[in-house]
UniProtKB/Swiss-Prot annotation:
Residues where Mg(2+) 1 binds: 233, 269, 297, 340
UniProt key word Membrane: no
GO molecular function: magnesium ion binding; xylose isomerase activity
Predominant subcellular localization, coarse grouping: cytoplasm
Sites where the protein binds Mg(2+) 2: 269, 272, 308, 310
Location of this chain's protein in the cell: Cytoplasm
Self-association state and partner proteins as the record states: Homotetramer.
Name the UniProt record assigns to this protein: Xylose isomerase
GO term, biological process aspect, one: D-xylose metabolic process
Organism field: Novosphingobium aromaticivorans (strain ATCC 700278 / DSM 12444 / CCUG 56034 / CIP 105152 / NBRC 16084 / F199)
Length: 437
């Protein structure tokens, strides 16, 4: 039944920029070689389960508008299986390699920890079968530690250690399932790992517990032999007012505090970056500089709204800047572009799921083409290198040399009567270079 939901749609193929086929790629040519690598291997696209197959089209003002067959009635074993079948069939029709899930996205509803584990185990068995049937792979798995009322005050940072333990059970099973299914990464998004009021919150206790939880996850990864990457997904707020994983730089400081900076990387979401007051490319550049760039959740926010709207990306210009940072970082190792995006509430047809993903995929592919052209042209990177060339000279090396003191550097400035010559940052010229490609 569920796979038939997409029976009227053919597999999406590349037809080139001049195609007028709404169900074809204009820029995503998966076998095109760019900078020595196939486009599919550069981008590693994934479809998410939660927005695409679990969200009913509801919002805080109204009920769901979608009539997906697997959303009719309770989320029992039958509907959960139908949802899984539809999801993997859809990923195959898009001709992208990966999908992503939370545990609760793929399983029947359950009461109690025993029933929860049993229901999830049944789902994992089925997913393993479906991956083989459809030739798709898992980019990453995760556990939903924010949706159930037990997590109203968080999981790892909850005042109640019993909730911490419940969360540990979910993460153990989700991590082991990710390992079994050949997942490339495991993600931790702390949607409620934060607080709403300082009046009832002990920040010190919560951060220690958060660090302990993450350390336990890393330890379990090694115990079971999982070779993928553990990822944290930064977000400044929503649903809590203050979240501890505010942005990439905050996460890195947290990882350093608990000695995990070589064990954990970040999964950066575009909309979360803008909520934190940064641009998407800033967060990618920061992760690159800190050596913790792992994976990307592709979406966009609304410039007029201060919340996480999770729209499909549609700005080639903005994503070209992001792709420059990804290329400079050496590209993905285990990560990829997961579409953490949803069609709008009025987009109720099955075709809309294709339009949203096709548009996002083509936007990112087009941005890759433009970013590669900028890299191959070399002017922008040459200017950046020239701007910082002084740090490769005698004084720059002296400043960083072991044993050099603040007084030593100050004495050089005085002895040489330094009078630095100002040089233009040429920002407008740089912006013009971007617009030429």
């Amino acid at each position: 039944m569920s796979a038939d939901y997409f029976a009227d749609f053919q597999t999406v193929r590349y037809e080139g920029p001049d195609s007028d086929n709404d169900f074809a790629y204009r820029w995503y040519d998966k076998d095109r070689v760019i900078l020595g690598k196939r486009m599919e291997d550069h981008l590693r696209f994934a479809v998410c389960m939660w927005h695409t197959f679990c969200w009913p089209g509801s919002d805080v003002f109204g009920a769901g508008t979608f009539t997906r067959p697997w959303l009719q009635g309770p989320m029992d074993a039958r509907n959960a299986a139908a949802k899984r079948e539809a999801a993997l069939a859809f990923v195959e029709k898009l001709d992208v390699p990966f999908y992503c899930f939370h545990d609760v996205d793929v399983m029947a509803e359950a009461e109690g920890i025993g029933e929860f584990r049993s229901s999830f185990a049944e789902a994992v068995d089925h997913l393993e079968e479906l991956q083989g049937k459809h030739g798709r792979k898992l980019l990453w798995g995760t556990a939903n530690l924010f949706g159930h009322p037990r997590y109203m005050a968080g999981a790892a940072t909850n005042p109640d250690p019993e909730v911490f333990a419940w969360g540990a059970s979910q993460v153990r099973d989700a991590l082991e399932a990710t390992h079994r299914l050949g997942g490339a990464n495991y993600v931790l998004w702390g949607g409620r790992e934060g607080y709403d009021s300082i009046l009832n919150t002990e920040i010190g206790i919560e951060q220690e517990n958060f660090g302990r939880f993450l350390s336990l996850v890393v330890d379990h990864k090694h115990r079971i032999g999982f070779k993928g990457t553990i990822l944290i997904e930064p977000k400044p707020h929503e649903p809590t007012k203050h979240q501890y994983d505010f942005d990439t730089q905050t996460v890195f400081g947290f990882l350093k505090r608990f000695g995990l900076e070589s064990e954990v990387k970040v999964n950066i979401e575009a909309n979360h970056a803008t909520l934190s007051g940064h641009t998407f490319e800033h967060e990618l550049a920061m992760a690159r500089a800190l050596g913790i760039l792992g994976s990307i959740d592709a979406n966009r926010g609304d410039h007029q709204n201060g919340w996480d709207t999770d729209q499909f990306p549609n700005s080639v210009e903005e994503l070209t800047l992001a792709m420059l940072e990804l290329i400079r970082a050496g590209g993905f190792t285990d990560g990829g572009f997961n579409f953490d995006a949803k069609v709008r509430r009025q987009s109720i047809d099955a075709a809309d799921l294709f339009h949203g993903h096709i548009g996002g995929i083509d936007t990112i592919a087009h941005a890759l083409v433009k970013a590669a052209a900028l890299i191959e042209d070399g002017k922008l990177d040459a200017f950046r290198a020239e701007r910082y060339a002084g740090w490769q000279g005698e004084l720059g090396r002296k400043i960083h040399a072991d044993g050099t003191t603040l007084a030593d550097i100050a004495d050089i400035a005085v002895a040489r009567d330094l009078a630095p010559v100002r040089r233009s940052g040429r920002q407008e010229w740089c912006e013009n270079l971007i617009n030429r490609v």
